Amino acid sequence: MSQNVYIVSTARTPIGSFQGSLSSKTAVELGAVALKGALAKVPELDASKDFDEIIFGNVLSANLGQAPARQVALAAGLSNHIVASTVNKVCASAMKAIILGAQSIKCGNADVVVAGGCESMTNAPYYMPAARAGAKFGQTVLVDGVERDGLNDAYDGLAMGVHAEKCARDWDITREQQDNFAIESYQKSQKSQKEGKFDNEIVPVTIKGFRGKPDTQVTKDEEPARLHVEKLRSARTVFQKENGTVTAANASPINDGAAAVILVSEKVLKEKNLKPLAIIKGWGEAAHQPADFTWAPSLAVPKALKHAGIEDINSVDYFEFNEAFSVVGLVNTKILKLDPSKVNVYGGAVALGHPLGCSGARVVVTLLSILQQEGGKIGVAAICNGGGGASSIVIEKI
């Protein structure tokens, strides 16, 4: 019951911009690409019989068909006997999937679990609520599925960015600080791309050629190249016109992508002679008032550290926070009194992108890359989610 949980493989797709390079792919198709990439790294595991369960995050599930996680599993070649569950914890969905997978192994219910998440925000549909009963008279409206189910608070109806503005006011974080943070995120991501830091984690996505044109491959994240410093600093505020601080440029963009992590028990690790990449040391989750979701990671991280048996936060080598907004990275670093040089060292979601159901796994995948390439041992990933919550995971590189 207390057996260790190991990460033996990770993979992710490049992250595509909204209506960009990955727009022809559904969330399920992206998820299958990521999972196939992860499977290819562990040929010792037999896809036809060794996998017990898949737990995959997905937020904008409308029009994807039943059970997206199940679709991903079968599209990637896993057995019909695999148990599949789709998780919606908004932005934290894929991290929750990893936590649930680890718990399943810890409890002895499974030995090999696929966890991760997928999202195509580009392909999320518009809804027509009046169509079911029939609009009787006058104009009707289309409801944007991305906005309704992904980007607006369910309790007050306000955009997540309005709450990001509240965070900036409450914690005295300026527009200049947010712009500087965003620019640094882009610059770190660009540098990491140039140096090949993401190469081992990214699986290329093949895009079918149109009208006889050859197929093409998307091999790198699309957003980092879009940095224009002057435009970023002069961008208008979106959510608060007077004295606002949050802009589209210092917030994460709308994106498409998928990530997968393969977890195994110690029993299977030894039986299959697998090489472990990391051990999951612990996890923690927290929640408070929905309007303050931005700094919920600062509540989840201490819980994760306690669960992992780590008493001193300064003993953590690297942190990976999902940058839903620049203010999220800033406020959690501030509250936890972290050294900024240890946070998001390859850049974050402001520059890389934030495909909702994928991001919780993406930050874990990138955190492991950082530990492997920058000489770290202990890493902490954390992500906030709409509704006031957050999830966090502690991993130790092996």
Swiss-Prot record:
Protein name: Acetyl-CoA acetyltransferase
Enzyme class: transferase
Keywords: Acetylation, Acyltransferase, Cytoplasm, Metal-binding, Potassium, Transferase
Function: Acetyl-CoA acetyltransferase; part of the first module of ergosterol biosynthesis pathway that includes the early steps of the pathway, conserved across all eukaryotes, and which results in the formation of mevalonate from acetyl-coenzyme A (acetyl-CoA). ERG10 catalyzes the formation of acetoacetyl-CoA from acetyl-CoA. The first module starts with the action of the cytosolic acetyl-CoA acetyltransferase ERG10 that catalyzes the formation of acetoacetyl-CoA. The hydroxymethylglutaryl-CoA synthase ERG13 then condenses acetyl-CoA with acetoacetyl-CoA to form HMG-CoA.
Conditions for induction: Induced by low intracellular sterol levels. Also highly induced by cold conditions.
Chief location bin: cytoplasm
Natural source organism: Saccharomyces cerevisiae (strain ATCC 204508 / S288c)
One GO process term, biological-process aspect: ergosterol biosynthetic process
Positions carrying N-acetylserine: 2
Catalytic activity: 2 acetyl-CoA = acetoacetyl-CoA + CoA
Subcellular location field: Cytoplasm, Cytosol
GO CC annotations, alphabetized: cytoplasm; cytosol; mitochondrion; nucleus; vacuole
Residues that, per the record, bind CoA: 186, 231, 252
